[in-house]
């Protein structure tokens, strides 16, 4: 069973995010990491990069494929999770604890609630 925590916002392209005080923490869902299997590399963006809703945020490579992760919002990247450059497999272990980037939110895109996302991936 795929883990879909309440209290997060989800996208149809399998990203999650949570906004606190105008800063969004962004990652990929448990469903996404389970489809990719063993993650071996994360190509993180640069702090200061500006992204719009739907832009490619970064790329994650697994033994199975390379997948783009899309920005769920418009804003500037304020922090990247450097730990993932050394240990990309941490995303497989805990996709909600191992966020990818933090962004200053200018505008949110369309999102799904946890309940709506659960229905999408059934």
Swiss-Prot record:
Which cofactors does this protein require? (R)-lipoate
Q: Which UniProt keywords apply?
A: Lipoyl
Cofactor detail note: Binds 1 lipoyl cofactor covalently.
InterPro entries assigned: Biotin_lipoyl, GCV_H, GCV_H/Fam206, GCV_H_sub, Single_hybrid_motif
Q: How does it assemble?
A: The glycine cleavage system is composed of four proteins: P, T, L and H.
Q: Which NCBIfam families match?
A: gcvH (TIGR00527), PRK01202.1 (NF002270)
Protein name, as recorded:
Probable glycine cleavage system H protein
Q: Which organism is it from?
A: Thermoplasma volcanium (strain ATCC 51530 / DSM 4299 / JCM 9571 / NBRC 15438 / GSS1)
Gene name of this polypeptide: gcvH
